[in-house]
């Protein structure tokens, strides 16, 4: 649409060709600055206002409010144009303020460039699967991961989860092993798709949401961590009685901001084969989470529903 920049226009190369210059003379009575070689020359009307302010006539409170309002509206318009594909509506309403921020615009440009030159997981329509499973206000349990799986057909926007018919990776196998001793009647589902939990209000959130194929942590420190911190912060501040399951030092560090008077936090070792015997097996986090949810008046999770 003419007059509206798209997200990717911020990252397009500067076109080459004839260089045009504008007349140094402002349009009479327009109050619009003319540009000469990139430098703005203020109109007489604008100069008068600037000089007046410099002489000790500050902007009125009403003018300051109007300026702030206009800036906020501009950010919202930019954010609305930058909504990523597949972002759930209720999540968008609460998190859209992030979309117009410079770090997020830069992040989206980086991911787009990566997709142009490399295989990136998960595919664009699945990066935000975690926002499509339930309303943001229906979240009950939060499990924090780190980085998406980087093999073919594995990652689909839910941490620890893999698409069918891909077999469960070792960490997920250990999660199922703990469930089989913690939850009565739990039987290995024969697949690794955890969408059944997500639909019940279990947020399965990685700190970083994309990865280059076969290169673990290749998209770390590009902006995803700041965005997912904003997600955790919103949940922490706006909901109550959530159960956060923090497995391993990385998740525990990311969850250090959680208000433990407002929410419940369960911590143990990561389910990776390297650390599973340091406390994950036998932690009983799944039954404990349900007990805490019931104390908060919430419906427990059916961990067998996969």
Swiss-Prot record:
The keyword DNA repair applies. InterPro entries: UDG_fam1, Ura-DNA_Glyclase_AS, Uracil-DNA_glycosylase-like, Uracil-DNA_glycosylase-like_sf. SMART domains: UDG, UreE_C. The record marks 10-11 as: Essential for recruitment to S-phase replication foci. The modification Phosphoserine is found at residues 12, 23, 43, 57. One of its GO terms (cellular component) is mitochondrion. PANTHER family: URACIL-DNA GLYCOSYLASE (PTHR11264:SF0). Uracil-DNA glycosylase that hydrolyzes the N-glycosidic bond between uracil and deoxyribose in single- and double-stranded DNA (ssDNA and dsDNA) to release a free uracil residue and form an abasic (apurinic/apyrimidinic; AP) site. Excises uracil residues arising as a result of misincorporation of dUMP residues by DNA polymerase during replication or due to spontaneous or enzymatic deamination of cytosine. Mediates error-free base excision repair (BER) of uracil at replication forks. This is Uracil-DNA glycosylase. The gene is Ung.
């Amino acid at each position: 649409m003419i007059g509206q920049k798209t997200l990717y226009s911020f990252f397009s190369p500067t076109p080459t060709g004839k260089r045009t210059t504008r007349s140094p003379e402002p349009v009479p009575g327009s109050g619009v600055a003319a540009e000469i070689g990139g430098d703005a020359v203020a109109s007489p009307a604008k100069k008068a206002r600037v000089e007046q302010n410099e002489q000790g006539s500050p902007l009125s409170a009403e003018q300051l409010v109007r300026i702030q309002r206009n800036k906020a509206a501009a950010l919202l318009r930019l954010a609305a144009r930058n909504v990523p594909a597949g972002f759930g509506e209720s999540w968008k309403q609460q998190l859209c303020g992030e979309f117009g921020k410079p770090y997020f615009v830069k992040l989206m440009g980086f991911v787009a460039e990566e997709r142009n030159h490399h295989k990136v997981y998960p595919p664009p329509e699945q990066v935000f699967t975690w926002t499509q499973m339930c309303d943001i206000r229906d979240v009950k349990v939060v499990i924090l991961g780190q980085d998406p799986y980087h093999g073919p057909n594995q990652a689909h926007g839910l941490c620890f989860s893999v698409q069918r018919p891909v077999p469960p990776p070792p960490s997920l196998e250990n999660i199922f092993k703990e469930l089989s001793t913690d939850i009565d009647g739990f039987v290995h589902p024969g697949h690794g798709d955890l969408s059944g939990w997500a639909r019940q209000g279990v947020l399965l959130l990685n700190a970083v949401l994309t990865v280059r194929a076969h290169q673990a942590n290749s998209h770390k420190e590009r902006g995803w961590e700041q965005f997912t911190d904003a997600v955790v912060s919103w949940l922490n501040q706006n909901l109550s009685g959530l159960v956060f399951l923090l497995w391993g030092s990385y998740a525990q560090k990311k969850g250090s901001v959680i208000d433990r008077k407002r929410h419940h936090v369960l911590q143990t070792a990561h389910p990776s084969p390297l650390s599973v015997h340091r406390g994950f097996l036998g932690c009983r986090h799944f039954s404990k989470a349900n007990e805490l949810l019931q104390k908060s008046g919430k419906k427990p999770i059916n961990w067998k529903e996969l």
